[in-house]
Amino acid sequence: MFRKILSVLNPTVFVLSLCFQIILIYTIIRHSPKNLSTLKAILLTNCCFQLLQSSMVFFTQIQLVNHLVPIELWSYGPCRHFEAFMCYSMFHILQTSSLVSGLTVFLTTFMKYQAARHVRPSKKKNCFVILFISSIVLISAGCGILLVIIQALPLEIREKYYRINLELDEYSVIGIVDYSVLPSRVNGIIINGLVVIVPITCLLLRRKILKLLTASSDALYFQNRVFLQGLTLQIFGHTLVYVPIFICSTISLITKTEYTFAQFFIFVLPHLTTVIDPLLTMYFVTPYRKRLMVWLRLKNDKVHSVSPSTFAVSANH
């Protein structure tokens, strides 16, 4: 049953994601005011990695068979027709791109929190935050590269998967996740840890932003209410598609109980954010919303002045 649903859902989400992300990238590049330069860089980074995430989900369509020891990766996507190491490499690209997407949500929330406090972070602080996030991504990506070299590229392993997949038609076995191997363990700690830490941190920052705005004037709160709505939807959206499915998958891993829904949807549910996020950005970032309204002929195409805002990093949200 799940395969029938996913045979329609996966390509549909991929096509929608491709369309919305391309439109958003064009809008960001062509219609971002100068005072949105920082947000522009963050959003473009997020768009590129979400495009990568969406492509990898579609081409791999992985079932994480985590009640087996070691965990097996089965691919139902187009890449199952290629050698297993290619699909296994795509799996690690998928993990890294999903990681970057989640961390950009945290970075955006953090920058907006600083702006709500009327604090412009020093270059040293900005560099530290970006370096910290980059180091997490690089460590995870490095572990992925090591795992491909160790667990997928050796000739005897490639021949083993070739023989296994000769007897399979609907899917291919593309690799394993073995937490007894150090790079896999490190990667697991990073990814599973951030699935919990990032949403909690973002929710706490959102709460602080709300307090700061509530304590300010009514005019200031009204001016930034649209921004707050968009921020709330994005944070809760990521929390809902990541946290429950990962908790279910972790329980399955520990108890060795087969939860088929979690196995099939652990990468599909986060895939939905690649469609939802560009829609939220287009609507809740004021300059992009104005441009969208012009395209939909709901507003005249004329130059709009950018109103001052407490959010220096993302003015007039």
Curated annotation (Swiss-Prot):
Entry keyword annotation includes Cell membrane: no
Chief localisation class: membrane
Transmembrane helix recorded as keyword: yes
UniProt entry keywords in alphabetical sequence: Membrane, Transmembrane, Transmembrane helix
Compartment(s) where it occurs, according to its Swiss-Prot or TrEMBL record: Membrane
InterPro entries cross-referenced by the UniProt entry: 7TM_GPCR_serpentine_rcpt_Srd, Nematode_rcpt-like_delta
One Gene Ontology CC term in the entry: membrane
Source domain of life: Eukaryota
Segments passing through the bilayer: 5-25, 90-110, 130-150, 185-205, 235-255, 264-284
Topology in the lipid bilayer: Multi-pass membrane protein
Protein family per UniProt: Belongs to the nematode receptor-like protein srd family.
Protein name: Serpentine receptor class delta-44
